[in-house]
Design a protein with these regions (language model features):
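Intrinsic-disorder/low-complexity, polar/charged segments enriched in Ser/Thr/Lys/Arg/Asp/Glu/Gln
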Residues: 1, 29-33, 65-67
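Compositionally biased, disordered extreme N-termini, encompassing classical targeting presequences
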Residues: 1-2, 74
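Amphipathic, hydrophobic secondary-structure cores in small proteins
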Residues: 6-58
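C-terminal edge-of-domain segments
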Residues: 57-74
Length: 74
């Protein structure tokens, strides 16, 4: 089980900033689950995290959110 960060209702770019801060707290290779609203957050946050070099995988979609798994890279 890995930590979960619920960012539903958080606007861009704050949801990306909060995700990055949480990633800074975990070790390289560790995982973080992030819940994001559909729309812009669902598109922008994973894209930005991938550009930072992290591995991002969509775990599933809820009625009002998407769940992603982020593996921290160095």
């Amino acid at each position: 089980m890995f930590p979960t960060l619920d960012l539903r209702g958080t606007s861009c770019p704050l949801n990306y900033v909060r995700t990055r801060l949480e990633l800074d707290r975990i070790g390289v290779g560790e995982e973080l689950e992030v819940w994001l609203d559909h729309g812009e957050p669902e598109e922008q946050v994973p894209r930005s995290l991938r550009m930072d070099g992290h591995h991002v995988e969509v775990l599933g979609h809820g009625d009002d959110h998407v769940r992603i798994r982020v593996v921290r890279r160095g």
